[in-house]
Amino acid sequence: MTGAETFGAISVVPPLLAIVLAIVTRRAILSLFLGIWSGGIIFTGSIGIIQTLNWTVSSLGESLFNAKILTIVMFLGGGVAMIWRLGGAKAIGNAATSRLDSQRKVGLATWIFGMLWFFGDYSNTAIVGTTMRDMADEMRMSREKLSYIIDSTAAPVATFGISSWVVYQLSMIEQGYEAAGISGQAPEAFSLFLQSIPFNMYCLFAIVMVGIIIITQRDFGEMLDAEHRSWKHGKVLRDNAVPMQSAEDSLGEMATDSPQLRYFLLPVGSLITVVFAGSAYTGIAAAGENPALIDIVGNAAFVDALLWGSFSMVAMGLISGVTGGLMDLEEAMETIIDGFSMMITAASILVMAWTIGTVTTELGTGIYVTNVAETIISPMLLPVVILFASAVIAFSTGTSWGTMAIVTPIAIPLAWSIGGSAPTLLPVAVGTVFSGAIFGDHCSPISDTTILSSTFTGADHIDHVRTQMYYAVTVILVASVMLLVWGATRITPLVLLPIGVGLLYGLVYGLSEWDASRKNLAPQAARTEQQSSPSDD
């Protein structure tokens, strides 16, 4: 008997309770804990507190992967702290200030930087968020807007680049083949992954949506309110907001009055070099003699490489700061520890998010939701059903990887069966699993990547979730329409994707005009490219 058969519809209570409480109370850790506790009550049929604590401890002690991620997060915090105290982030800002003299240019630079940093979503949010925050503040871009740009060019970009995401996706495809019993009859996993890219429409449209929002400078929903507040009154955070971190408060003043680029380039260069070298080394070692590039990528230990790289960033920051005479060893170590401390809130939420993921696994939440979705599947509806089943599971559990693990072994056999034991529907099944998982991840306040986006941009976490949700929902609706058209007509997605981009642009224009008129605000929040530093009203 599976967890879904045992607990049924009540299995969705813990994640939904946590999500609703987080949105209403804006207290993510408390809300997550109460959601976990409700799961303990359901699971045990009693007060459930012992089960709740056991689940929480197991999230820390029984998963090597989770331990590595927590260590990476702490090292990234320490590395960012060293870069900030040594003036590296300020030096980047100073070097770019003469060129990035408008909010649009800062937004475009952040967008491009995020797309170039394609090999990891965690390091993407850490480096891009920290580097661009001061420039965004100077141009009066709201922290909510910066968090949105960072978040939507982290995981979506990582799904297409040389990253741990792609390796994980390939492993999920193999699991789907095994579940369907078609390993010798279907395309190679990497080939299917490439075929699925045009159907990963949420990620493609999410990246494009960021560009449309930045270039047109049009906003709607709660983001319009945030941008209007920031631009008109200089408040990059709303009154009473609780930002996830503040480098100034946590780390103190910079150790120099003359920031130099080397204090950014050396630690970050070390991170990049070690991550790429470590990935190549582990990939070659595991792939055997004379491996092809695909084999190297498929066998690379990207998480391990990121662990080594984040450590090297801390070490290089310490060495360059001490040898450069900006601080002694004791002060450097205190800075690193301050950086660790700065990540405690994010680490706490990550542990709670992983724990509620354990709860949903034990109660069978994902399997229950997927089984319900299966009852309405037809060839035409298959892409949209998989998309929204994945979205609901990811939103409820806060983990896109966990969602892929739950849905892919079900979606691939379904697509094979509905497609008449032919591979026709496999690419769309794989692409829509990934799309739905990342959409749910973007909208969930218990998602690790969403949490880290708030952390490294210094935004209020729930404010980030609430403002981003309007844009994510817009993107998923456009993706749904395009997938429905594909299901009905089988027109190539290479034709549908440009149409979807045009529809996105039209929606952004129309919604921004309507919302601004409704709120009696300028659709562009009174921003003008001629003003590099707006005056207060």
Task: Go through each PLM region and give its residues.
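Transmembrane alpha-helical segments and their short flanking loops
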Residues: 47-57, 163-202, 210, 290-291, ...
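Hydrophobic transmembrane alpha-helices of multi-pass solute/ion transporters
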Residues: 2-78, 91-99, 270-351, 365-376, ...
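C-terminal transmembrane helix pair
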Residues: 84, 158-161, 179-180, 344-356, ...
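Membrane-embedded alpha-helical segments and adjacent helix-loop junctions characteristic
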Residues: 47-147, 326-420
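Inter-helical loop and helix-membrane interface segments of multi-pass membrane transporters/permeases
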Residues: 2-6, 44-62, 167-199, 211, ...
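Hydrophobic core segments of alpha-helical transmembrane domains in multi-pass membrane transport
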Residues: 14-24, 35-42, 72-81, 113-117, ...
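Long, contiguous bundles of hydrophobic transmembrane helices that form the permeation core
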Residues: 191, 206-299, 311, 315-334, ...
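Hydrophobic transmembrane alpha-helices that form the pore/transport pathway of multi-pass ion
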Residues: 97-186, 190, 396-439, 449-463, ...
